[in-house]
Structure formats: C-alpha cells, structure tokens
Amino acid sequence: MAIDPAVLDAARAAFPSGTRAITLGAVVHETQCGGEPLVGIPLSMMNRHGLIAGATGTGKTKTLQLIAEQLAANGVPVFLADIKGDVSGIATAGVSNDRVASRARDTGYQWQPNGYPAEFLSLTGTKGAQLRATVSSFGPLLLAKVLDLNETQSSVLSLVFKYCDDKGLLLLDLSDLRSVLQYLSGEGAADLKDYGGMSKQTVGVLLREMVELEQQGADRFFGEPEFELADLLKVSADGRGTVSILELQDVQNKPALFSTFMLWMLATLYHDLPEVGDVDEPKLVFFFDEAHLIFDDASKALLDQIEQVVRLIRSKGVGVFFITQSPKDVPAEVLGQLGHRVQHALRAFTPDDEKALKAAARTFPKTKFYDVQETLTSLGIGEALVTVLSPSGVPTSPFATRLIPPSSRMGPLTDDELQQRLSSSTQVRKYATAVDRESAREMLSARAAAAAPDQDESDDETVKRNERAPAPRARAGKEPPSTFEQVLKSPMARTVAGTITRGLMGALMGSLGIRRSAPRRRRY
C-alpha cells in the first residue's frame, strides 16, 4: 500500500526542494513511508530556535546529532552540551550496518559515512579544554541572578563592583569577591561612606550563597584564562563548522554550575556579537541536551534572564535548541520562543502523562492528515512529528517523519580515541594552565601587610616612652610603708583575718549555747 499522494503533495508544498535546509527525513502516514527525504528545517530559520522532545529511547540524541552534523557540513559552528556522553562520536565517521542501510532505503537518502571537526570542552578540565570566566565578566546583575539575591542584596553587590572599579581592584575569581566583602565589612567599612554602606547580615548572605555555588564546582569555573567565545565560531580549513562538545557527565548532578555557564555564554555572545537580523545561515547554533537540568530549581530571576537572552539572541544570528523528554520541562515563556518542533513519541502511563500528552498535542498546528494525540503515542524509534517555521515565518503543518541516519558514529568515542584527540588539541593546551595574576585578594593582602609594620613601630615607640618616663615619687613627709604593713593591708590578709575571726566567734557562741540564725534567702 502506497502513501496517500495528498500527504506527499502537502509535504512538498511545505518543504520546497529549492530551499537550503537541514534534511530530517521522509513523511510517514498510516505506517507508510513516502520514500523521499522531503522534511527539513530551512537553514535561514535555524536562529528561530527549536525543541527536540520525546520519551527515553525514542531517538532524541540521534536527531540532535543529525542536525548538528548537517549544520557543520554547511559551514555553521555548533555547540553541544553532552550530558550523557553520547554525541562525541560525531568526530568520527559512522559505520554502515543493516539498520543504517534499511533506514536509508526507506527514506530514499544516499547515506555516506563522515566525521566532523570537533573540539572538546569541560567545566572541570577532565575531558576537554577547561572553561573559565572571570567574576568581572559576569557583572553584578548577572551574578545576582545566579546567586538568587533579593533587591537589597543585589544593590550591595553592585556597590561592591562599583567600589572595585573605582579602586582598581580586579575581581577574577570568587576568592577576590570574598576578600573584598570581608574587607568592606571590617577594617575597610569607612571606605564605603561615599557609597552608602552595607550591613554585615547582607554580607553574610552573599558569602553563604557563594559557598553554595562553590560546592557545585564554581571555584574551577571562575578565573583565568577566560574562555574566548571566538573559539566557538571557528570554521575548519575545508569550510566546515567546528562542533564544540561540552562534556558534562561529571557535573550532571550540579545543575547550578551548568546553568551559570550557559547563561554567561549566551549573555556574552549577545553582548559581543553584532546585530545581523535575518541571515541565510546562522552564525552559531546551540544544543542543550537534558534541558530540564537548566530549569529545575532555577530561581524566577534566572528563568526570566534565560527567557530574555533566548528571545533577543536570535537577532545576533544564534540559534538555541533544547532537548528534553517532555515539552513541559521547558518553562512556557521559553517554550513560546521555540519555532521548530521535532517531537518524538510520548508515553502515557499515568494520569499526569496523559495530561502532558494532551497539552503537547494542543501546541501543534491544525492538520487534516493526522490525529496529533494518537500519532504522538504511535511513533516508532527514530520517528517524530515535525513542524518548523517556513522561510516566511509561518509554522508548517505537522508531518510524521521517519528520520534519516546520522553519517557520523552513533555512539561515543572510546577513552583512547578521546585522549588522542585531547592530546593533539591546541585549544586544550591553550586553557590547560590556570593563571593567578595579582587581583583584589592579593592587593588587599599587600595593603594589610604594609600597614602592619607601621602598627608595630607605633607599639615599640609607646614602650620606649614608658621606659624613659621617671618613676612616680613618694608623697613628701611620709615614709613608705614597711613590708609587714603592706602585707596586713593586702586583700588576702583581710580575708584570712575575717575567716579566723568568724571561726573564733562561732566557737565561743557555741560554747555559750547560742545558735546562729540561717541566712535570709535573696528575693528576686
């Protein structure tokens, strides 16, 4: 049984063949595959962001890999946040097997093995180039959102940054910020008279929030040399975009660190990149796997900042794709900014799952060819319901799609393969060694050390003056008391005498038959 020709005609109209696009796959309708790789995302619309969602094991990571490698092939640099370590294989060519051959045949795709230029990055420096950023580059507003500070605490942090700017104190890492806070809440408090001052309670909150961030590994992230975001925009000698892979297996239980880096990176790109508006191809595309780690437990201020950056960075030619199990993992404000949807199968085992399924189905455009809710539960592995923004900015009707196989390896590099690539990477060597140049912490320590000798000299001078001073003279006309008189006048002598007297009087009164009255109880 052949696929309904009306479905194919509608797909050809939605995805015209003359458009430069990222090929996704062939249309599927009532279990029949169209045999033509028609469905794709226009390259000029990749900066309109997207969502890749679906239950575990439905093929989300392979879809991510498929889109990323085609972007690289078109000269577009790519950034991948790899939580599970599944996509490092993009750096080497895939191997054909029966499943690959069958999928290529079903979709009418001419599959060829290929690897792509890749660089590996790390927030801990263990499996890639060490990523770092300075506290100064964050600035007080962004850092306040990361630390989840209230308005008063945020204003104090801004005050501290202003003070450091005025005094030439560099804030490179968290130890610099801690040193300044401790100084200004102690011996340097007088320096703040022109800035408004700050309470020790507020300083305590800031220090505690910093400790919490450090416990997630931020002490490794803040510092120098700072990662140059231009390294994410590299194109290889043969014109292919570089795929930068951030290995996150060792920090997947530290979402605050991941969120901190992501927000800094997007905000810095937005600040540094020029406005380009609508372009033929994006300047850079991000893929954030396991996106719920970014949004889980994030503060309202941080979510607002992420939503704002995602909304605005489109005009810089940068696209952002989130990969997660369910659309409900992404806040509605962010979800509304995602123009492309590649929705793999959803499972409805519980009432909550059923509710999420209905909500996901309602977000798709209307279509006369599919029952969207039923289709979402019947998709096979490597199939997805796809709707994208056309070059005119209008969402296409959703089409069930059988995805083509990636041309790179569908699996991670071995440890030996990864180490070989790291050892030959100039980028890894560039960021391998931390730089600890003079900054606020060292400058304040030097200032305290310079003040210490002055204090010692002052103390020595006081001692010398006391030694030179003449001894006090005895009062005229009266000889000094003898040693015996001094002993009798001492407090101890008076105490001993009183004890002896009370003992003698007690014995005398007892012999006369007189009882001593009990002492009165003190009333309070």
Language-model segments: which ranges?
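Conserved P-loop NTPase motor module
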Residues: 1, 6-7, 11-16, 28, ...
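Accessory regions of macromolecular translocation/handling assemblies
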Residues: 1-103, 133, 144, 271-276, ...
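Conserved ATP-driven motor cores of ASCE-family P-loop NTPases powering translocation/secretion/packaging/pilus
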Residues: 2-3, 66-68, 91-110, 308-394
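Generic beta-strand/beta-sheet core signal
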Residues: 44, 53-55, 81, 121-123, ...
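Flexible loop/turn segments at secondary-structure boundaries
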Residues: 48, 59, 86-88, 127-129, ...
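Hydrophobic alpha-helical scaffolding
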Residues: 57, 147-150, 196, 296-299, ...
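P-loop NTPase motor domains
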Residues: 68-78, 85-308, 334, 378-379, ...
